[in-house]
Structures are given as C-alpha cells and as structure tokens.
A protein has these predicted regions:
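Sec/Tat signal peptide C-region and signal peptidase I cleavage site
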Residues: 19-23
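Bacterial N-terminal signal peptides
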Residues: 11-18
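Surface-exposed, glycine-biased beta-strand/turn segments
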Residues: 24-108, 139, 169, 181-207
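Bacterial N-terminal signal peptides that target proteins for export
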Residues: 2-10
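Zn2+-dependent peptidoglycan hydrolase active-site motif and core
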Residues: 92-130, 154-156
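A generic structural motif
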Residues: 83, 114-116, 160
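Conserved beta-strand positions that form and line the central face of beta-propeller blades
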Residues: 81, 89, 112, 122, ...
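Conserved, short, structured surface segments that act as functional micro-motifs
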Residues: 135-201
Length: 207
C-alpha cells in the first residue's frame, strides 16, 4: 500500500468513525414528548422571549427538501402535501434528533425531528418509518418510505416552533424546494409564537 493510499484509507476510516459517533449520540425524550405531537420545547426560550435562525448562508449539506423530486402544495396554510412516486424516500430537512416515530390515528406513520436550530419538522402518512426515537439524523438522511395508495403517494410535511404549526412557506419555497435566504425571528407571545423575517424579500413568501 502506497503512502497516498494509506492516507486515503486513514481519512476514510476517520470519517466513518465520526459518522458512527454522530449516529450513536442518542438524545433522551420524555414519554410525553414521544407521544404528544404538539408539545412545547423545553428551554427553547430560556434566554429570552425570542431567538433567530439564520438561513442566509446555509450549506448544501445542511439542508434537504423532504422529497426532492416531489410536487408540493400548501394545505390550509400550515402544512405541505408533497406528492411523489411509490417507494420514494422521505428525507430529513436539517440535522436533529428523532422525537417521535410511531403510528398516529390522525396522521398514520409519523416522524417528528427536533432540530438543532430550534425548529421541529413533521413527516406524516409514511408507509414505513425507518428511524427510532432518540436517534440523531443528518440533513438528507432517509427517515421513511412515502405512503399512499394506487392513486396518490404523498408526504404530509409540517414545521413547528414550540409545539405550534407555522406556515412552512415562510421558510421554504414549495415550487423551487429551496430555503428562503433570510434571518427569521421567533418571538414568544403568551401561548403562541410569532414568526417574522428580519432580512428577506418578503414578496417571495407565498401567502
């Protein structure tokens, strides 16, 4: 084995071990967090009544549209229906940890990811969930197989802050599947959270 090939082998081994260590860093969630879809995020506003998330310079490896080849449409202002083909893989939008992975009477097989940036994302109507509660996932990692029937296969996708739905088109363009380049501010007001863009072309946001 040449010196160059040895170096490549060592680098590959280190990357594999790093990925394995990331996957094994299980996150603990309470029984309530594992069962309740809509639940507040402990400590989210511990440093004040607002926080910001910067989407203006997100690397390609840090974001993935849940179904990259799907067609997305907004449903009632709070979720996206992403229609695709049978057998397609549902992907994690950002890095995070699996808070819920179970069958729900209302949403079928559902997965909720609590992300490091403070958001939570919902992936519902899955044929099969492929991740477990507490598991760390990376952006673009396969979470589930899309569900449906012979007429339509789709994922019901949503975004939450502190247990409440927000309009996902504030953050992502359903047509281009791209993140909107902006900084958003999440402000807690009584029992709700207001979402506002602090730096963006507001005309691009789908109402």
């Amino acid at each position: 084995m040449t010196i160059r090939s040895k170096k490549a082998y060592v680098i590959g081994l280190l990357l594999s071990l790093s990925s394995l260590a990331f996957a094994q860093q299980a996150v603990l969630f309470t029984p309530a967090e594992q069962q309740q879809i809509f639940i507040t995020t402990a400590g989210l506003f511990s440093n004040g009544n607002n926080f910001t998330i910067d989407f203006s310079d997100v690397d390609d490896s840090e974001y993935c549209f849940p179904l990259p080849v799907g067609n997305a449409s907004l449903l009632q202002g709070y979720s996206l229906e992403i229609v695709t083909s049978k057998g397609d893989a549902v992907k994690a939008m950002f890095d995070g940890a699996v808070r819920m992975s179970r069958k729900s009477p209302q949403y079928g097989n559902i997965i909720i990811i609590r992300h490091d940036n403070g958001l939570e994302t919902i992936y519902a109507n899955n044929a099969q969930n492929l991740v477990k509660v507490g598991q760390r996932v990376k952006a673009g990692q396969t979470l589930a197989i899309v569900g449906g029937n012979k007429n339509k296969y789709s994922c019901l996708f949503g975004i939450m802050v502190n247990g409440g739905w927000i309009n996902p088109t504030i953050i992502v363009d359903p047509n281009s599947h791209q993140l909107r380049s902006q900084v958003i501010r999440c402000t807690k007001k009584s029992n709700r959270v207001d979402i506002g863009a602090t730096k963006t072309d507001l005309q691009r946001i789908v109402s």
